[in-house]
A protein has these predicted regions:
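Membrane-helix interface/capping segments
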Residues: 47-61, 252
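Alpha-helical bilayer-embedded segments of polytopic membrane proteins, i.e.
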Residues: 2-48, 63-89, 93-107, 199-242, ...
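Cytosolic/stromal cytosol-facing helical appendages immediately following the last transmembrane segment
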Residues: 2-20, 122-125, 129-130, 134-201, ...
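Short alpha-helical catalytic segment bearing the HExxH-like zincin motif
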Residues: 108-112, 229, 279, 283, ...
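Intramembrane catalytic core of multi-pass membrane enzymes that act on lipidic substrates
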Residues: 55-176
Length: 351
């Protein structure tokens, strides 16, 4: 029997279904829908945070919620296909607007749920995660995130962790290039360790699939289909990397006397406990608990007393795009955390 508090996660299906409807009305309608949804979620987060109740620590995960994510994976492929059909004969402006609307969903939700499924021990779920990331032409995330970002988050060694004073626009080229390079280095190292050839590499095959899909789309739908797919992928990746920028901005793990990094703690990620955006994003904003317990299902994540964002991700994406505004909001929070909240919160989180 589903727990009442978990029924809010049914909102996960709202965005792709609404996007499917709006794609059928053309690029302008799809773009207006996207802006409207973004504004509503950002506004609700800002003016009615509606803080969630954390589940009791001993609560068992709800298996049906994994099914919701699996259904979403199917919906995303259908949404991209619908967008391709609409874009093939559309004006170039409509191609761009359709790609932006679809990329909003595949980035805000698709990559978020690929991330959740990729943390699963289920082969099916990990396969769906690879499918979702390949559908936005970013399969190397599946290597870099789990083998690179998680061990190195909140350090200067991690290209996906933003440094204090680093603007989003300086961060983006660094993380895009660094994550791609490190993913292939990690994959090569693992293949050597396992004494396997590149023919066994899912990263290689997924990357070849991106090339194959590109060629097939060009042959089937011409330049418009190809541009649509790559543009929606670019929008999705931009959303992903902007969220990465937000999640660990300015937070650093100390280097211990032996040269090792201190363990990841509650103070090494920014959090936002907003009920609407967390319902749409599978509790991704409870980011400290996620990093401290990476295999935890999203519905069991706790709201820990770590550093708090000024609003949810929907609003922070806009704030981060304006560096002076972002720095003005975040640097006092960094200083406040360093001045005393960190020690108190880390004691509480370990009780």
């Amino acid at each position: 029997m589903p727990r009442t508090r978990d029924l809010r996660f049914l909102l996960i299906g709202f965005l792709p279904l609404l996007a499917l409807l709006n794609v059928s009305f053309g690029g302008v309608a799809a773009a207006l829908w996207t802006v409207g949804i973004w504004a509503v979620v950002a506004g609700v987060d800002a003016f009615w945070p509606g803080a969630q109740r954390s589940p009791p620590p001993a609560d068992a995960p709800q298996g049906w919620l994994v099914g919701v994510l699996r259904v979403y994976a199917v919906l995303q492929i259908v949404l991209i296909a619908a967008g391709l059909l609409a874009a093939r004969d559309a004006r170039w402006l409509d191609v761009a607007l359709l790609a932006g609307a679809v990329g909003f969903v595949t980035g805000a939700q698709g990559i978020t749920f690929a991330h959740e499924l990729g943390h699963s021990r289920s082969r099916l779920d990990r396969a769906l995660a690879w499918l979702l990331m390949t559908s936005v032409a970013y399969p190397h995330f599946m290597v870099e995130h789990y083998r690179g970002h998680h061990p190195r988050a909140a350090t200067h060694d991690d290209p996906a962790s933003a440094r204090r004073g680093e603007s989003l626009w300086r961060f983006l080229p660094r993380t895009l290039a660094g994550s791609l390079r490190h993913a292939w280095q990690l994959e090569a190292a693992q293949l050597r360790q396992l004494q396997r050839g590149w023919a066994t590499s899912p990263l290689l095959w997924s990357s070849l699939a991106v090339v194959g899909v590109s060629a097939a789309l060009l042959a089937w739908g011409g330049a418009r289909a190809l541009v649509f797919w790559w543009l929606q992928s670019a929008v999705a990746v931009l959303l992903l990397e902007t969220v990465n920028y937000i999640e660990h901005y300015g937070l650093q793990r100390a280097t211990l006397p032996g040269g090792q990094r201190e363990p990841f703690a509650v103070g090494h990620a920014w959090n936002a406990d907003h009920v609407v955006s967390n319902s749409l994003l599978a509790n991704l904003q409870r980011h400290s608990d996620h990093h401290m317990h990476a295999w935890k299902p999203f519905d069991t994540l706790q709201a820990l007393p770590g550093p708090q964002l000024p609003t949810g991700y929907a609003g922070c994406l806009l704030l981060a795009a304006v560096p002076p505004l972002w720095f003005g909001l975040m640097h006092p929070r960094l200083e406040e955390w360093s001045a005393g909240e960190r020690g108190e919160a880390e004691v509480l989180s370990n009780l």
